């Protein structure tokens, strides 16, 4: 049995690791936490543009159709960087709930919004 990450998983892992290393140092993180929102909208937008928000969702909803391993790659790298943006709450918890228990109408309404980041001015609203 092969437990190596796929090429796509390695690319995602490397892109998140590079983001954390180059753009998410301790002082940046402290400034984000101290801000009024407690997160960076610019970073959240970047996550959407890079496809990180859409990894676990079906292609029909704007996602990549990823699986739990794909999601764990993202969570591991974000965790290593102590990234404070609400990936877990938004994508894993809320998105996962809608994906697994939502009606077709709810999935069609909410999952593309998570993938493409257009629910509201702030992802926590």
Model feature map: region roles:
Residues 118-125:
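Conserved small/polar residues in nucleotide/adenosyl-binding loops
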Residues 85-104:
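N-terminal glycine-rich flavin-associated loop
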Residues 1-88, 109:
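Amphipathic, small/basic residue-rich leader segments at the start of a protein or domain
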Residues 104-111, 120:
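Short secondary-structure capping/junction motifs at helix and strand boundaries
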């Amino acid at each position: 049995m092969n437990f190596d990450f796929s090429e796509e998983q390695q690319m995602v892992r490397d892109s998140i690791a590079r983001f954390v290393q180059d753009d998410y140092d301790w002082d940046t993180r402290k400034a984000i936490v101290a801000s009024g929102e407690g997160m960076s909208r610019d970073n959240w937008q970047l996550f959407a543009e890079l496809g990180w928000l859409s990894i676990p969702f079906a292609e029909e909803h704007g996602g990549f159709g990823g699986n739990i391993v794909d999601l764990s790659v993202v969570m591991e790298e974000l965790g290593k960087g102590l990234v404070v943006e609400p990936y877990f709450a938004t994508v894993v918890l809320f998105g996962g709930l809608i994906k697994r228990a939502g009606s077709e109408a709810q999935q069609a309404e909410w999952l593309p919004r998570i993938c493409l980041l257009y629910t509201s001015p702030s992802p926590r609203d």
